Amino acid sequence: MRIALFGARGIPHTYSGTETFFGELAPRLAARGHEVIVYCRRSLFSRRPSSYRGVRLIYLPSVETKSLSTPTHTLACAIDVLFRDVDVMLVTNVSNAILCIVPRLFGKNVALNVDGVEWNRSKWSSLGRRYFYWSACLAGKICPDGIITDAAEMQRIYQEEFGTRSVCIAYGANIENSADPDVVREYGLEPFKYYLIASRLVPENSADLIIKGFEQLQTDKLLAIAGDANYRSAFVDGLKRTSDRRVRFLGHISNSDHVKELHCNCFCYIHGHSVGGTNPALLKAFGYSNCILALNTPFNREVVGNYGILFQNDPRDLAAKLETLERHPDEVISLRKRASARILEKYTWDHVANQYEDYFRRLVAGDSPAMDSPLGMYVPQHQELATTQVLSGPR
């Protein structure tokens, strides 16, 4: 198959989970003999190689502002792809739904990964949230056979709220171990002597709640916050006004090896994401064998299962859970040992690639996967064949 992917910043890029998703999925599809294109935002790449791990890269312009970067780049991609011999395209972000009309009018097969419930994100204006909701309403009408949700709860929301059937395919994660624990000392940290937040500093990721809970904890451990906002915000300024000297702001860290070491050597990873589906940052933490303490939401519960601890949307409850971990370090060790099993159970990137490959084949063949598949995680019709292709490499 000839497959095009767009809607993200491009690859290789580490800003968010969408770029990680493209960076993991596209090379795996290419390794199976498919011709894969990933579109990249030209202004974000000073170096512009023509390929990456067997994937062709195409750089197109965008207007780099908070509200215009995604739609302007997606529009450029949607027009460019019309002039290429592509069997199927994967577009991310529900805000791009309206732009999928362009390739759909020309008979192209389009799959739209709707991502999270963007209309609930406080970082957007009231007008922006209404636009996301309208896009979600429209998505199933534009791509009736091509809607992808990344969690069972998201699948339920789209069916009950918008009457839209979807295929549920989650994200994945790799299992990685620490290679150089001394890296954390470059950030003023000591291995297993700090708690970690690793996320964009936006209100729905709950860094304010986590800081308030941590401030109530009697411990000599630090709270390391790896991440920042893409744009200047009063929310971030407020976070940094904490008087607790144990709270350390590390800023955005683009070095993936450093991100890995910060994860692998933390005492506990605290995940405060309150909006969205299967969160790539949470899966990544499991892949790094973290002890996971996650905000209790339907999406987080779905991923965490019995492999981590949940806290309520209350600093006092978080403080109590932190205190329990402080008193029972053996529980931390036990959760760390079990974490990677969660990834192997259902969230490996090879499994995700199997699902997408099978799903794309069915779209190209004219099937209706969303209508034919039961609710819950998508099960490839040709799973054994797909696994064989992974093991045997390129065709």
Can you describe what each PLM-predicted range is?
Residues 82, 105, 128-147:
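Membrane-proximal helix-turn-helix segments that form the acceptor-binding/catalytic region
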Residues 261-277, 290:
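Acidic donor-binding loop of glycosyltransferase active sites
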Residues 8-14, 22, 28-65, 153-159, ...:
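N-terminal strand-loop element at the rim of the active site
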Residues 71-82, 86-119, 277:
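An aromatic- and histidine-rich active-site surface loop
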Residues 236-257:
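Nucleotide-activated donor-binding/catalytic signature segment of Leloir-type glycosyltransferases, i.e.
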Residues 309-316, 324-330:
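Conserved acidic donor-binding segment of nucleotide-sugar-dependent glycosyltransferases
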Residues 137-180, 189-192, 197, 248:
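Donor nucleotide-sugar binding/catalytic pocket of nucleotide-sugar-dependent glycosyltransferases
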Residues 4, 186-218, 224:
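Conserved donor-binding/catalytic core segment of Leloir-type glycosyltransferases
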